[in-house]
Amino acid sequence: MVHGDLLYHDGLFFSAKKEDGTYDFHENFEYVTPWLKQADLAIGDFEGTINKDHYLAGYLLFNAPVEVMDAIKEAGYHVLDLAHNHILDSQIEGVISTADIIEKAGITPIGVYTHEPRDQAPLVIKEVNGIKAALLAYSYGFNGIEQYISKEDYNRYLSDLNEDKMKAEIERAEKEADITIIMLQMGVEYQLEPTEEQKALYHKMIDWGADIIFGGHPHVVEPSETVEKDGDKKLIIY
């Protein structure tokens, strides 16, 4: 089971704040938790950061209270995608702290590399009912904040749309897993149709070995399609 953004605007902070100054976000998931609990693998896109040493922010930058992860864990998520344009909203420290808080909740982050550099990191592979699923995630950009970090940190921690890197990673996933799932942050916000660039890249990914591509970023429902490759059907959701 896969869905789009967990995007915490400051209005959600206010509604979740308790009299003692702490937060409780469990109510946010009241109606979806029964569905998430049924999933063999539940993947969400956490669009923002959690950095306790940075001020809270709910637009244009996003940095949520640490308590959001308690609610996300209890809702039933197994994997959270961090490859998105807001992952640098509380700087590199926010990338590291967000991934660390997710891991401490027993959830697997994808789309950032906080242990080994991207070019040395092992693939994230989840075995579900005997099927090995490789999970990869990529973002079109980082809202220009990347210009304020070093090239070394950019290449080490982040997962961008460098085609040579993506091709190598997807081809490797095809060898190591039974199915390759891509979470992709790309497109134009609030546009109901994919761009030509989206279509071209998503089809390249199918050629490289991707089986399912879940697109994100537009914040509206764009079309989906099935693609025939080597006698199998591949799924693209733009």
Where are these regions (language model features)?
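Acidic, metal/ion-coordinating pockets
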Residues: M1-Y238
